[in-house]
């Protein structure tokens, strides 16, 4: 295989990181909704923690996207 083929295989594998971020965010918010349904008085605190967690999960997806773009254009 030449280097261009290996580069595109690496870019395809970076999609796993973006898939993982999407799964993480969906898991965070489904847990948030079930937790608020059980204990509505803690909704404000739970929502704050869920948004921080979702931001961190999205950051992993964005890092993976940036690395994929660097691989494409380098």
From Swiss-Prot:
Signal peptide stretch: none
Membrane topology qualifier: Multi-pass membrane protein
Cited InterPro entries: ATP_synth_F0_csu, ATP_synth_F0_csu_DDCD_BS, ATP_synth_F0_csu_sf, ATPase_proteolipid_c-like_dom, F/V-ATP_Csub_sf
Record keywords, A-Z: ATP synthesis, Cell inner membrane, Cell membrane, CF(0), Hydrogen ion transport, Ion transport, Lipid-binding, Membrane, Transmembrane, Transmembrane helix, Transport
CDD domains assigned to the protein according to its UniProt record, in alphabetical order: ATP-synt_Fo_c_ATP5G3
Membrane in keyword set: yes
UniProt GO cellular component terms: plasma membrane; proton-transporting ATP synthase complex; proton-transporting two-sector ATPase complex, proton-transporting domain
UniProt entry tagged with the keyword Ion transport: yes
GO MF: lipid binding; proton-transporting ATP synthase activity, rotational mechanism
Superkingdom: Bacteria
Annotated localization: Cell inner membrane
Segments passing through the bilayer: 8-28, 52-72
Subunit structure: F-type ATPases have 2 components, F(1) - the catalytic core - and F(0) - the membrane proton channel. F(1) has five subunits: alpha(3), beta(3), gamma(1), delta(1), epsilon(1). F(0) has three main subunits: a(1), b(2) and c(10-14). The alpha and beta chains form an alternating ring which encloses part of the gamma chain. F(1) is attached to F(0) by a central stalk formed by the gamma and epsilon chains, while a peripheral stalk is formed by the delta and b chains.
Family, as annotated: Belongs to the ATPase C chain family.
Name of the featured protein: ATP synthase subunit c
């Amino acid at each position: 295989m030449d280097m261009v083929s290996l580069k595109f295989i690496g870019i395809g594998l970076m999609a796993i990181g973006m898939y993982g971020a999407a799964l993480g965010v969906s898991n965070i918010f489904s847990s948030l909704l079930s937790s608020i349904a059980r204990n509505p008085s803690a909704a404000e605190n739970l929502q704050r923690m869920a948004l921080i967690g979702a931001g961190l999960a999205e950051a992993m997806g964005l890092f993976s996207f940036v690395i994929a773009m660097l691989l494409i254009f380098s």
